[in-house]
Amino acid sequence: MSTEFPLILANDIDYTYPNGSVALKKINLNILKGELVGIMGKNGAGKTTLIRTFNGLIRPTTGSIYINGENIKSKTVGTLSQKVGIIFQNPQHQVFSNTIEEEIKFSLKSLNLNKKESQVRVDTILKNFDLEKYRERSPLNLSGGETKKLAVASIFCRNPEILIFDEPTLGQDAKEIEFFINLIKNEQKNVKTIIIVTHNIEFAMEFIPRTILMSDSQIIADGPTHKILTNEFLVNKTSLILPQINQFNRALHDIGINCPLTITSKKNMIEFLIGYLKNKSNRVIGENL
């Protein structure tokens, strides 16, 4: 559960690429310790650029970013990576070593652990991510899902306070998505701050309580996911599609079933339909007595 502490604070940040392309405009946001936050928007909205500013890979043209109350302007990427871990959409670009075990060890270099401490962490992570049997395998021989799992394992081995995932469900099968969801739930128990960039609106509706919506390099909405992603104007502006639950709700209204528009979860929809059918059944029985 979140505590009222702005772990990430962005004040009026702008970023313009060397070619003159504007990627971020007047971004103001704060993310609390322990929060789970989604960032959504169409391609080119500035989502990936924004998360890269959090660990110093991109430095804002103007404005300031604070992590744990510290301005990160003078912090190196190596220093920031101890606090902020990012798993990018294409994890194969994050793999550098000859074996899986070496890859995870490589991620610990900036922590200056002794050999024993390092090996304990590596062994624990290999076990937790079900990668023990692959420790001597080359990362180049892994499937896309396994490579993404290795990238996540390498970041988790550093135990950063902030975890950022760029399109974690993209290209993943049902089993891999389930593994990721369980991973996130466990990290929430450890009061980790988690940011997820995603286009998966159904995933966001079910698992992400707060969503930041971006369009044209700006934040256009920030608040409870169930309110933002059911707002037709905002969804259309960002080229997203209304959640299936809302489309189903509309279909019910079209056939005369007045389902409350406030229903935004499958569980609540099922409860409503069961109640509706019971009431209708009771009325039919009463009319035939």
Segments from the language model and where they lie:
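ABC ATPase C-loop
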Residues: 155-156
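Conserved ABC ATPase "signature" C-loop
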Residues: 216-217
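Conserved ABC ATPase signature
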Residues: 138-142, 146
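Helix-to-loop junction immediately C-terminal to a conserved catalytic motif
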Residues: 55
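Conserved ABC transporter NBD signature motif
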Residues: 63-71, 80
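Catalytic Walker B motif of ABC-type/P-loop ATPase nucleotide-binding domains
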Residues: 163-166
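Conserved ABC ATPase "signature" region
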Residues: 116-134
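The feature captures the beta-strand-to-loop junction immediately N-terminal to the Walker
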Residues: 40-42
